[in-house]
């Protein structure tokens, strides 16, 4: 029987060798407007170095740094946060090339109302080649922004991601991570793990969620990440991230389309009932989420669900019929993917006769994604979802952003092409979390447009 729990490579490596890289997948640093001090600019360089050397993707939030040209009244003029962005890019480049795992990822975040946000959006890729950029926003920031056109163009180019600004129940801001599926306090970390839906019969789904959350909560207390002096201690940093992969495999096995599943999710959320295969899947999924939420609450977790980009994990996961499981909850771009790696050469992975994105269509996929996020959000323990848009289907305009802001989605991640003969989704992720993809990365970094990202 295939495993119903898909561990991240980081977690498995740590279990095998606790002296190796740390098991946490991601961390966040919010830079204060000062060169010195424990949360200042210089401290952020050390923090990023530590995160990369020990295998965690690092999001650096720059919005507290004064804009370029701002005078502090003491004769000093600020150079602005983008000038420091080049240092983070160089750190990632240098540490990746010299490190053991060669899997670093850094994302720079800036709020839409920062005075330098236009420079942040328009900075050419070659000036920040080893980092990605994300703009954080609220409804109000979007309405007041004078840079909507430039932001939309940045999204179209694939240079800019979006993340909604969020606060915890006590009014403290929490910050998006590298892949935008997790929200953390500064110096917080998160363990990730995924339920392999493709390995589940319907009756197995609730138990799989219970098992996955139980394992995460047990591991959370053992990691010792706070002992490093860089990360928050686990006693106060209370979150994990249980996600899922292989949804397309599960739907194929029970002959349920994304359209039917999405409509059923919508009906269930609105109080409907039924006995179709789609309804049985929805009910099992909802029960699993509720059971996992009880485990997280019993362990004093403040956030516990996160749907991460899981391409690398999916390659190591199979469904009940022996096919490779598809990443996260989206339909794949193709039924077959070739992965070219330095270690294993070209490997071909077959997803079986699953629905693919061009067959599903944007509206039906989004209905599924919104429905699952609604189920997670109702627990009060949801982080978010690394939600991709389909650039050859959707139109990036003001209406699109406003619909996204009104949706249960928390991020707008990669802009992927899904129609016809285009690259596989997992390649578009530029899977930096596994040493086996060095060949792909070497080819990528020899091109003019560099694409650095963390995913598992």
Regions found by a protein language model. Name each.
Residues 1-456:
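Long, C-terminal-biased catalytic regions of enzyme "large/alpha" subunits
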């Amino acid at each position: 029987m295939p495993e119903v729990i898909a561990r991240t490579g980081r977690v498995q490596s740590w279990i095998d060798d606790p002296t190796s890289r740390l098991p946490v997948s991601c961390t966040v640093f919010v830079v204060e407007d000062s060169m010195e001090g424990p949360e200042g600019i210089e401290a952020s360089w050390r923090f990023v170095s530590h995160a990369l050397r020990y295998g965690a993707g690092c999001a650096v939030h720059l919005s507290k740094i004064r804009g370029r040209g701002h005078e502090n009244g003491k004769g000093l003029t600020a150079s602005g946060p983008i000038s420091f962005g080049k240092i983070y890019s160089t750190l990632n480049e240098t540490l990746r090339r010299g490190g053991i795992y060669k899997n670093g990822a850094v994302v720079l975040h800036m709020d839409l109302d920062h005075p330098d946000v236009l420079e942040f959006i328009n900075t050419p890729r070659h000036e920040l080649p080893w980092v990605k950029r994300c703009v954080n926003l609220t409804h109000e920031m979007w309405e007041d922004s004078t840079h909507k056109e430039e932001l939309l163009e940045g999204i179209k180019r694939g240079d800019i991601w979006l993340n909604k600004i969020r606060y915890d129940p006590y009014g403290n801001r929490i910050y998006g991570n590298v892949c935008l599926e997790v929200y953390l306090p500064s110096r917080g970390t998160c363990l990730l793990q995924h339920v392999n839906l493709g390995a589940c019969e319907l009756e197995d789904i609730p138990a799989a969620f219970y098992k996955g959350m139980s394992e995460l909560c047990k591991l959370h207390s053992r990691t010792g990440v706070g002992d490093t002096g860089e990360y928050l201690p686990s006693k106060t940093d209370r979150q994990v991230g249980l996600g899922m992969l292989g949804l397309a495999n599960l739907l194929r096995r029970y002959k349920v389309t994304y359209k039917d599943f999405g409509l059923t999710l919508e009906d269930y959320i609105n109080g409907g009932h039924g006995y179709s295969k789609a309804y049985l899947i929805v009910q099992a999924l909802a029960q699993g989420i509720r059971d996992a939420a009880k485990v997280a609450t019993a362990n004093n977790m403040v956030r516990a669900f996160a749907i991460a980009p899981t391409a690398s994990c999916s390659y190591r996961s199979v469904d009940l019929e022996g096919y490779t499981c598809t990443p996260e909850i989206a339909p794949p771009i193709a039924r077959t993917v070739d992965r070219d790696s330095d270690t294993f050469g070209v490997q071909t992975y077959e997803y079986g006769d699953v629905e693919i994105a061009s067959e599903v269509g944007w509206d039906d996929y989004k209905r599924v994604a919104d429905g699952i996020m609604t189920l997670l959000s109702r627990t009060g323990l949801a982080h978010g979802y690394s939600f991709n848009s389909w650039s050859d289907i959707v139109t990036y305009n003001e209406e699109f952003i406003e619909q996204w802001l009104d949706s249960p989605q928390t991020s707008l991640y990669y802009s992927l092409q899904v129609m016809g003969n285009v690259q596989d989704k997992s390649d578009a992720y530029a899977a930096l979390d596994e040493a086996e993809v060095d060949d792909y990365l070497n080819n990528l970094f020899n091109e003019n447009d560099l694409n650095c990202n963390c995913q598992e």
